[in-house]
From Swiss-Prot:
<keyword id="KW-0489">Methyltransferase</keyword>
<feature type="binding site">
    <location>
        <position position="141"/>
    </location>
    <ligand>
        <name>[4Fe-4S] cluster</name>
    </ligand>
</feature>
<feature type="binding site">
    <location>
        <position position="314"/>
    </location>
    <ligand>
        <name>S-adenosyl-L-methionine</name>
    </ligand>
</feature>
<dbReference type="InterPro" id="IPR004383">
    <property type="entry name" value="rRNA_lsu_MTrfase_RlmN/Cfr"/>
</dbReference>
<dbReference type="InterPro" id="IPR027492">
    <property type="entry name" value="RNA_MTrfase_RlmN"/>
</dbReference>
<keyword id="KW-0808">Transferase</keyword>
<comment type="similarity">
    <text>Belongs to the radical SAM superfamily. RlmN family.</text>
</comment>
<feature type="binding site">
    <location>
        <position position="134"/>
    </location>
    <ligand>
        <name>[4Fe-4S] cluster</name>
    </ligand>
</feature>
<dbReference type="GO" id="GO:0002935">
    <property type="term" value="F:tRNA (adenine(37)-C2)-methyltransferase activity"/>
</dbReference>
<dbReference type="InterPro" id="IPR007197">
    <property type="entry name" value="rSAM"/>
</dbReference>
<dbReference type="GO" id="GO:0046872">
    <property type="term" value="F:metal ion binding"/>
</dbReference>
<keyword id="KW-0698">rRNA processing</keyword>
<keyword id="KW-0963">Cytoplasm</keyword>
<protein>
    <recommendedName>
        <fullName>Probable dual-specificity RNA methyltransferase RlmN</fullName>
        <ecNumber>2.1.1.192</ecNumber>
    </recommendedName>
</protein>
<dbReference type="InterPro" id="IPR048641">
    <property type="entry name" value="RlmN_N"/>
</dbReference>
<dbReference type="GO" id="GO:0000049">
    <property type="term" value="F:tRNA binding"/>
</dbReference>
<keyword id="KW-0004">4Fe-4S</keyword>
């Protein structure tokens, strides 16, 4: 267990071009490499400068065009006139004793999302949001309490990554990306894939697809589209229950889908990508943590190449759910392992700053308890 300590909340005001008066500039992170090359040619500049600019953003961690010292002064002035590197502000930065850091990012239109940097030994992982809010309605999760406003652009997703990277010392680099922040990533597949295309590229963050995980409640058509994209990202399916009756209570979107179609789509993704599947299961005390639940879960996973990530519930103020007892957790694990299921109980990180699984939220106001 992690010893809980009071939250350290550090208000951070960051001035960006998006805050200035006058016409809003183009968000540079929304522009593809080809679009940037075309723009450079229109400005009378060489197209190869596009990769130089990318390297400054992702490897050089530049936050202004003036820092891009190997670019001609005229080009730096042109970039400054037309583009903003960042299009949002850091409203609040919170840091926990275990090294986890969370940023509340305020977007140009006033929307807010949260993203997290997790430190675990040599690993430097980031948890990134894909939507402002979430429409999936999982009853125990903070992210969907206020519904969903809109999808994030690829640039807004990349901006979260860069802001989290800036929290690292110069001799450290990001190692893993998990699309497990606010929102349903597969409900914003174009934005997510465009951001990850940059994140995995050599002139981007250079992170292998094998170190990138996309989480989903299980949207079969979108899972098939992800498979068709042909990039072997890790897929994590949020299951949370071993039968349709209970899952439909906890994950309302299941009423329109059902567990079996989700499992079949996950199987298709496994065969297309060659990547072992991960299933996520938030363990709720007295609700889905019983011996029979564990046995049913073992049955539906039998014969599948999977890793089962079990996450003891991280409390959300105002919601009527609790973390299971130590005895219930131990029994649940024992039943899964005795059935041959590869199981990992996720270590709690960042819960003291509401940065743990299921705690990310855009509105920290009063929570109305759900039934």
């Amino acid at each position: 267990m992690i010893c809980l300590t009071p939250m350290v909340s550090l208000p951070l005001v960051t001035t960006t071009d998006s805050e200035s008066t006058g016409p809003r500039k183009n968000h540079l992170l929304n522009w593809s490499l080809d679009q940037l090359k075309d723009w450079l040619q229109e400005q009378g500049q060489k197209p190869f400068r596009a990769k130089q600019i990318r390297r400054w953003l992702f490897s050089g961690r530049a936050t202004s065009f003036e820092e891009m010292t190997d670019l001609p002064a005229k080009l730096r002035a042109q970039l400054e006139e037309h583009f903003a590197i960042f299009n949002a502000t850091e409203a609040v930065v919170s840091k926990s004793k275990d090294g986890t850091e969370k940023i509340l990012v305020r977007l140009a239109d006033g929307g807010e999302v949260e993203c997290v940097l997790l430190r675990d030994g040599p690993r430097r992982s980031i948890c990134v949001s894909s939507q402002v809010g979430c429409a999936m309605g999982c009853v125990f999760c903070a992210s969907g309490l206020d519904g969903v406003d809109r999808n994030l652009t690829g640039g807004e997703i990349l901006e979260q990554m860069l802001r989290l990277q800036q929290r690292l010392p110069a001799d450290e680099r990001l190692s893993h990306i998990v699309m497990m922040g606010m929102g349903e990533p597969l409900a914003n597949l174009p934005g997510v894939l465009s951001a990850l295309d940059v994140a995995r590229s050599e002139d981007g963050l250079g992170i292998s697809p094998r170190r990138i995980t996309i989480s989903t409640v299980g949207l079969p058509p979108a899972i098939d589209k992800l498979a068709a994209a042909g990039i072997p990202y890790n897929l994590a399916v949020s299951l949370h229950a071993p039968n349709d009756e209970l899952r439909s209570e906890l994950v309302p979107v299941n009423r329109k889908i059902g567990i079996e179609p989700v499992l079949q789509a996950a199987d298709r993704y496994f065969h297309a990508s060659g990547r072992r599947l991960t299933f996520e299961y938030v363990l709720l005390g007295g609700i889905n943590d019983g011996d029979e639940h564990a046995r049913q879960l073992s049955q539906i996973l039998r014969g599948r190449s999977v890793m089962m990530n079990v996450i003891p519930y991280n409390p959300v103020a105002g919601l009527p759910y609790r973390t299971p007892s130590g005895a219930a957790i131990a029994r649940f694990r024992a039943i899964l392992e005795s059935a041959g299921v590869n199981v990992n109980f996720r270590q709690r990180k960042g819960d003291e700053i509401n940065a743990a699984c299921g705690q990310l939220r855009r509105n920290r106001g009063e929570v109305k308890a759900t039934k």
